[in-house]
Design a protein with these regions (language model features):
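Active-site segment flanking the S-adenosylmethionine/decSAM binding pocket
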Residues: 166-224
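Membrane-proximal basic amphipathic "stem/tether" segments
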Residues: 1-41, 45-46
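Short alpha-helix
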Residues: 147-159
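Class I SAM-dependent methyltransferase Rossmann-like catalytic core
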Residues: 28-74
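SAM cofactor-binding core of SAM-dependent methyltransferases
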Residues: 56-150
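A short helix-to-beta-strand connector/capping loop
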Residues: 102-104, 163-169
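Conserved small/polar residues in nucleotide/adenosyl-binding loops
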Residues: 226-228
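A generic secondary-structure signal
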Residues: 65-68, 95-98, 156-160, 178, ...
C-alpha cells in the first residue's frame, strides 16, 4: 500500500526525491493533525492531497464512510458528483481495495471542463455572489476555483489505483443533462461536490431516492452558500 501511495503522490511517474520527502513530511504532519486516523489513513490522505481541495478531516470522514459500508457489506454503487482531479474517488478506490471490496461500480460525474456557471441562487453568507468570485479566476487553470481537470488525467489517476477499470464509469457533462439519462440503480455512497444550488438539487432529486438502507450521503458544500 505505501509503495502505491508514494507513487500516487509522485504523480504516477518517477518522482523526484524531494517529492517523496514532501510526502513523508505530510504523513508525519497528518499523524499529529488527525489523532484518530490510522497510519494507513494518513498515508492515503497524504497521497491524494494534490488531487483534491477537500480538507484532511473530510477525506478521513470519507475513508471512514467507505470502510463502514465495506465492513457492513451494505450493497450499492458509489457515486461522486463533482470530481475535479479525482482525489476523493482515488481515496475511495484505495479504501475499497484495502477491504477486498472491488465488485462495486464507481460513478464519476463531472463536466471535466471546469465548473458550470453559477446562478443567482449561489450567494454566500456575506452576500457575495459566486459569479463575482469566479470572475476573478482563470477558468483554465487547474488549481483555480473553476476546478478544470481533463477526463484523461482523471482516468489516469483512477487507473493507477488498480481498481478494476470495468467497474469505473465516467459520465461527462453537466449533471442536469446527464443524470436524467444515466444513473445507477442502487447507491451505497453518494458524495455531492458540485458547489451550486441547481446542480445539487438535481443530484438529490435523481439520486437520493436510489440510496439503499444504511447508505451514506455526503454534501461537501453544505452550508457553504445560503441555499445549500
Amino acid at each position: 500500500m505505501k509503495t502505491l501511495l508514494r507513487r500516487l503522490y509522485g504523480k504516477q511517474k518517477t518522482a523526484a526525491p524531494a517529492d517523496l520527502d514532501s510526502y513523508d513530511r505530510k504523513v508525519s504532519t497528518l499523524r499529529q493533525q488527525l489523532p484518530d486516523a490510522t497510519e494507513q489513513d494518513c498515508e492515503l490522505i497524504a497521497a491524494v492531497q494534490h488531487l483534491t481541495m477537500t480538507s484532511p478531516e473530510r477525506i478521513l470522514a470519507l475513508v471512514n464512510a467507505v470502510s463502514y459500508l465495506a465492513t457492513n457489506q451494505i450493497e450499492g454503487d458509489f457515486v461522486e458528483c463533482g470530481v475535479w482531479k479525482g482525489g476523493s474517488m482515488v481515496a475511495t478506490a484505495n479504501t475499497l481495495i484495502a477491504h477486498g471490496d472491488t465488485d462495486r461500480r464507481l460513478w464519476l460525474y463531472d463536466t471535466f471542463e471546469g465548473m458550470s456557471e453559477p446562478t443567482e441562487e449561489d450567494v454566500d453568507f456575506m452576500g457575495q455572489s459566486a459569479d463575482r468570485l469566479l470572475g476573478e479566476q482563470d477558468r483554465l487553470q487547474s488549481d483555480s476555483i473553476w476546478c478544470f481537470s481533463p477526463l484523461e488525467q482523471v482516468r489516469a489517476v483512477m487507473q493507477d489505483t488498480g481498481y478494476p477499470e470495468s467497474k469505473v464509469n465516467f459520465v461527462q457533462g453537466k449533471v442536469e443533462d446527464t443524470l436524467p439519462q444515466t444513473k445507477p440503480e442502487s447507491i451505497a455512497l453518494l458524495r455531492l461536490d458540485t458547489d451550486w444550488y441547481e446542480s445539487t438539487r438535481c443530484e438529490l432529486e435523481h439520486l437520493f431516492p436510489r440510496m439503499v438502507d444504511g447508505a451514506v450521503l455526503i454534501v461537501d458544500d453544505y452550508l457553504s452558500l445560503i441555499h445549500i
